[in-house]
Amino acid sequence: VTILLRALGYSGKQAGAVWPQGYLDLAGSIGLTGGLESLRAGAAINRAQAAQLFVNALKCKTADGKVYYETLGSDIKKKTIVLAVGVTTDDGSTSGAIRTTSNKNAEAYLPAHGDGNPVALQGRRGDLVLDNNGEIITFVPDDSTATTITLSGDAQAAYVKGNGGQQYTISSDALVYIGSEGEGKSWLDAYASLTAGTQITMYSERGKITAVYSTTSTTT
């Protein structure tokens, strides 16, 4: 915790003279220990907890008042959905390449350092941070509400129904993204391709569905 606070630019001036409790209190106040309420001074942490700390750190504000992940790159793609991972790039490489809703003409981004194949991020929405070369530095999932369902019948012009019988209203200006395609389409242009048995993920903001993601537009 202390090391991450230092990386964020904090020092004993902000944490106070009492160590380690002062640092733990500071970490809690900026959200660094969010989701880790059981964390105590001197307690061991496991890998999952350590990973959570690093994810939290990306979203924390630095001592200068800036969101940390926004200081890491030169270009930030907001509210980006990861459409596909391991895709083929122009040079034939597939190592860690991902396609997102921020890409134009189905271009694929590569990681700035090392290889990666973040399958768990497919279908997630968040902010994509790029360097000067347009390569990925990090992806920070956002806190948008996401609901995944399997369609019980073909999608309709104004709504969809899940296997559990629940119905969801979708506005005509919602964007639909298919994992195998590069660019989004309006709901009215895309809903007819979402047939019974298709799994979709719907993203909501303030109670309104604003985007829909599907790995495929046909029943598998």
What are these regions (language model features)?
Residues 34, 93, 170-172, 210-212:
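Generic structural signal for alpha-helix starts
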Residues 62, 215-220:
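Serine/threonine-rich low-complexity intrinsically disordered regions
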Residues 107-109, 166-175:
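A short macromolecule-binding patch
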Residues 132-134, 142-144, 192-217:
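Active-site-adjacent structural elements in enzyme catalytic domains
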